[in-house]
Amino acid sequence: MSRIGKKPIGIPDKVEVKINGTVVDVKGPKGQLTYTFHKDVKIEKKDKEVVVNPVNQSATARSQWGVARTVLGNMVTGVTTGFVKSLEFNGVGYKAAVSGANLTLNLGYSHPIEYKLPKGIEAKVNKNVIEIHGSDKELVGFVAAQVRSFREPEPYKGKGLKYTTETIIRKAGKTGAKK
């Protein structure tokens, strides 16, 4: 029995949930999200709650039960409050700027990196912090990981892009040979 899966998901007043078989459409103040769930999971709307149940007791159905409930909960949270991932850049001459749907990064390469933000994702730059906002948790995390991959932090000086919650384990440099 899934501890996570059996918890019902409360639907706030501003959120509208439509269920059509395995396709669930969630609409709220921050946008609209659609997701197709696994066929072994049954999703039902009861009053101001959404309940997720397995179709049968197979291993696949039980494993998808908790996943479906978590994804659905993230959809409701995303359309009400949204999600944010913050990246911090550290290095001499490193800069970032947002113009429309493009994120321009100067990360010590011979050329600036132009990253086109996907639909539904916004970026804000404050000094040396890039904030990525969106209603889809998976997409926000994916975009943050892609941006971080342009210049991952190195362990000697800590230069590069890192999540603000991430700690980089620093290494000691080489010590000169003694004569």
Indicate residue ranges for each PLM-predicted region.
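N-terminal intrinsically disordered, cationic/polar leader segments
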Residues: S2-W65, R69-A145, S149-K179
